[in-house]
Each structure stands twice: as C-alpha cells, then as structure tokens.
Regions:
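N-terminal intrinsically disordered/low-complexity leader segments
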Residues: 1-18, 203-205
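Helix-turn-helix
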Residues: 22, 26-69
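Short, basic, alpha-helical segments at the C-terminal edge of helix-turn-helix-like DNA-binding modules
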Residues: 71-77
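Hydrophobic alpha-helical connector segments
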Residues: 82-114, 162-166
Length: 205
C-alpha cells in the first residue's frame, strides 16, 4: 500500500476556498441591504474578515465579478432548496418555502430585507452582465416549479406563466415587506399564490 501524503498546498487551498466563500457571503448580504451601487468592497472585506486586497486575489474582475458570483450563489442555493422542497413537500409546500426563506430575513435581520438577485437585476442597463446573472437565477427558480406543474397535467404555457408569477409575486412582496418592516406582505402573497395554484390544478382535472 502506498503512503498517502498531505501536501502543504492542500490546507492553503482549503483556506483559499473558505476565504472566497466568506467574501461571496458578505457580498450577498450587502447586495440585499444596499444594492449593487451601495455595495462597497471595503464593507465586503469587513464582512468576510479579509484584507481588502484579497478581494482582487479571489476576484480579479473586482466588484462586478464578485457581485455576479454572489448573485449566482444566491440563485443556486435557493434553486436547490426549491428542488428539494418540491420532492419533499410538493407544490403547495414549496410556495410556503418562499415565504419562509424571506420571512426569516425580515424577522432575524431587518437590515437585510431584500434579495441579492433582485438587486442585481436592477443593474441593467448599466451592467448587463450582472443583470444576466439575475435573469439566470430567476429562471433556475422557475424551471423546477414549471416542471412540477407539467407533472400535474398543467399545460406548458400555463406552467411557465404560473412559475414566473410565483417568483415575481414573492419578489414584489419582499419589496413591500421592506417598506413596511413587516412580514404581512409576504404572508398575503404566499396565501394568494396558494389559492391561484388550487384554481390552476382544479382547472386541469
């Protein structure tokens, strides 16, 4: 049996990945709080507990690259939650999941009421690359919902329309929740979507 050697580079590589992940996490928080224009690199470095210069080490493209990757990370994380929820809780339960995700932000971190993906979307037309990352993320949330509706016998056109309605309604409710400092708009939005889902499924039977 050969000897397995752990090289000095492996711990450094792990530390590098951890540092990069912390910066992305900080960028996601700041996008939600302040939007892209208000996201300062010094604040990202502070959130990530990293020297400001390390941002350019991990993200040579600077603020834009960091924001794009933070947007994609948010999209990927929520997309994975949606897919898992659809498997475990079904369509109605997944509508509730949207409310739960953002309700926690309103309650636990009022200063972070917002969605990094929505903040990135507002960058168009000044930054089409960032807006494209937001569009990609929104689509990754809509597609599994539409697929689940297709599995229930809903037509493709109606499934895609309803999936888009879910994302648009929740994002709009999040803006209202931020203005009100309350979860009520989210609760109302999720309740309304649940009723619309019931009507849609009933119409296919």
């Amino acid at each position: 049996m050969g000897i397995v050697r752990v090289t000095d580079g492996e711990p450094r590589e792990s530390k590098r990945r951890d540092g990069r992940a912390l910066l992305i996490k900080g960028a996601r928080q700041l996008l939600a709080e302040k939007g892209y224009a208000g996201m300062e690199l010094r604040d990202v470095a502070e959130r990530g507990k990293a020297p400001r210069g390390s941002i350019y080490h991990h993200f040579p493209g600077g603020k834009r690259q960091l924001a794009v990757e933070a947007t994609r990370a948010e999209g990927k994380e929520i997309g994975a939650l949606i897919e898992r929820s659809l498997e475990q809780r079904g369509l109605r339960g997944t509508l509730g999941l949207f409310g739960e995700i953002f309700r926690r932000r309103v309650v636990d971190h009022p200063e972070r009421i917002g969605c990094p993906v929505a903040a990135a979307a507002l960058a168009r037309p000044e930054d089409p690359e960032l807006a494209a990352a937001a569009t990609e993320s929104f689509r990754s949330w809509e597609e599994p919902i539409a697929a689940a509706l297709l599995g229930e016998g809903v037509s493709r056109a109606d499934a895609e329309t309803f999936a888009g309605l879910v994302v648009s309604t929740v994002e709009g409710a999040l803006i209202r929740a931020r203005a009100a400092g309350s979860t009520d708009p989210l609760d109302s939005a999720v309740g309304g979507l649940a009723q619309a889902l019931d009507r849609l499924l009933e119409a296919t039977r």
